[in-house]
UniProtKB/Swiss-Prot annotation:
InterPro entries: Cytochr_b6-f_cplx_su8_sf, Cytochrome_b6-f_cplx_su8. Pfam families: PetN (PF03742). It comes from the Bacteria. This is Cytochrome b6-f complex subunit 8. GO terms for molecular function: electron transporter, transferring electrons within cytochrome b6/f complex of photosystem II activity. GO terms for biological process: cytochrome complex assembly; photosynthesis. NCBIfam families: PRK14747.1 (NF011331). It is a single-pass membrane protein. Keywords: Electron transport, Membrane, Photosynthesis, Thylakoid, Transmembrane, Transmembrane helix, Transport. SUPFAM superfamilies: PetN subunit of the cytochrome b6f complex. One of its GO terms (cellular component) is cytochrome b6f complex. Component of the cytochrome b6-f complex, which mediates electron transfer between photosystem II (PSII) and photosystem I (PSI), cyclic electron flow around PSI, and state transitions. The keyword Oxidoreductase does not apply.
Amino acid sequence: MDIITLGWVGVLSVFTLSIAFVVWGRHGM
């Protein structure tokens, strides 16, 4: 696994987590 692939996976996971937290926050959870 290259560093570029690892970097992309990290960016995507952080982005997905931030979206999930925003959605949860809007639903009052």
